[in-house]
Amino acid sequence: MIALALGLLIGGEREFRGHPAGLRTMALISAGSCMFTGLGLIPEFPQNVDPTRIAAQIVTGVGFLGAGSILRQGELVRGLTTAASIWVAASLGMAVGFGYYWLAVFVTVLVVVVLVSLKPFEERFFRNRAHRRETDVQPDELPQ
């Protein structure tokens, strides 16, 4: 339940901004990662199960989900923040699965703060072409 709730918090921000990986996606990624991690810790399995190998496979699987969210349109690359959010949602689920509840809650708060508060700062200082110097040459302005 904790992993699901943490995924919902991150997914809520993504959903609010209209990104494709929203509430359901982030909640499922966090809950699934927690479940796989927790299953690896059950001592009753007939074979020896290494939880770190399960964690590595979670990271690999989530990498495919993240890669699917990244789109390139000309020189514009979209979806990197969503891909990173998917990656973090999985790590939060794994942290909860390993029993690091407070770490997962703390990181979730930090992630939501970064997603919500840095967007206006980034747009103001780094993406506004109106504030660039006239002598700055952009790649699309170079002579052919």
Question: Positions of the model-derived regions?
Answer:
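Alpha-helical transmembrane segments and their membrane-interface boundaries
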Residues: M1-I54, Y101, F121, P139-Q144
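Short glycine-rich loop/turn motifs that provide flexible caps or phosphate-binding loops at active sites
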Residues: L6, I10, A21, A31, ...
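Membrane-helix interface "capping/anchor" motifs
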Residues: F16-A21, I70-T82
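Alpha-helical transmembrane segments of multi-pass membrane proteins, especially transporters
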Residues: A21, T25-S33, T52-T60, T81, ...
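Small-residue-rich segments of transmembrane alpha-helices in multi-pass membrane proteins
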Residues: L28-G38, T60-G63, A84-G97, Q138-P143
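Juxtamembrane membrane-interface segments at transmembrane alpha-helix termini
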Residues: F36-E44, A67-L71, L92-W102, L115-R127
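Alpha-helical transmembrane-segment detector that highlights a single hydrophobic TM helix
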Residues: Q47-I70
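Canonical alpha-helical transmembrane segment with a positive-inside/aromatic-interface signature
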Residues: Y100-Q144
